[in-house]
Amino acid sequence: MPDLYAYTDGACSGNPGPGGWGVLMLAREGEAVVKERTLQGGEVLTTNNRMELMAAISALEALTRPTEITIVTDSAYVKNGVTTWIHGWKRNGWKTADRKPVKNAELWERLDAAQQRHKVVWRWIKGHAGHAENERADELARAGMAPFKTR
């Protein structure tokens, strides 16, 4: 059975501004890629953090059955949020430790629901540091943003 990876990225022109998200999904047997799928999308007025979340959500929602997957993101916001902060937010009724509403709560709730049926390993990598798969995800995110940018 191949190992499944999703490399996710978000992009925004202005923050807020037009934005996009991209996902490179790879099925690997050892070092060999046996299947590849790309996803992308965007919005006219959004933030970089929202696009990073949408990339991860879209990767998980694209899976048609319960799956073991490694999601690789260059967003510390997504990685820390989904592996650490979310537990307290849920306990506090989607409020932060200082009782303020969690930003992007509807996307965090969607991500939380999307990951429930899968076995997800979350991995953070440094962005724009020469990781080929992350660079592809960035290209997809920029392509997802392109239709929403005005010249």
Swiss-Prot record:
Keywords: Cytoplasm, Endonuclease, Hydrolase, Magnesium, Metal-binding, Nuclease
Top EC class, one word: hydrolase
Protein name according to UniProt: Ribonuclease H
Gene3D superfamilies, alphabetized: Ribonuclease H-like superfamily/Ribonuclease H
Keyword Zinc annotated: no
Record text on cofactor binding: Binds 1 Mg(2+) ion per subunit. May bind a second metal ion at a regulatory site, or after substrate binding.
Catalytic activity field: Endonucleolytic cleavage to 5'-phosphomonoester
Protein encoded by which gene: rnhA
Subcellular location: Cytoplasm
GO BP annotations listed: DNA replication, removal of RNA primer
Family: Belongs to the RNase H family.
GO cellular component: cytoplasm
UniProt-listed PANTHER family: RIBONUCLEASE H1
Binding positions for Mg(2+) 2 per the UniProt entry: 9, 138
Quaternary structure and interacting proteins, as annotated: Monomer.
InterPro entries from the UniProt entry: RNase_H, RNaseH-like_sf, RNaseH_domain, RNaseH_sf, RNaseHI
Ligand binding (Mg(2+) 1): 9, 52, 74
Coiled-coil ranges (or none): none
Molecular-function GO terms, alphabetical: magnesium ion binding; nucleic acid binding; RNA-DNA hybrid ribonuclease activity
Record's function text: Endonuclease that specifically degrades the RNA of RNA-DNA hybrids.
Domain of life: Bacteria
Cofactor names: Mg(2+)
Domain RNase H type-1 residue range list: 1-146
Annotated NCBIfam families: PRK00203.1
EC number of this enzyme: 3.1.26.4
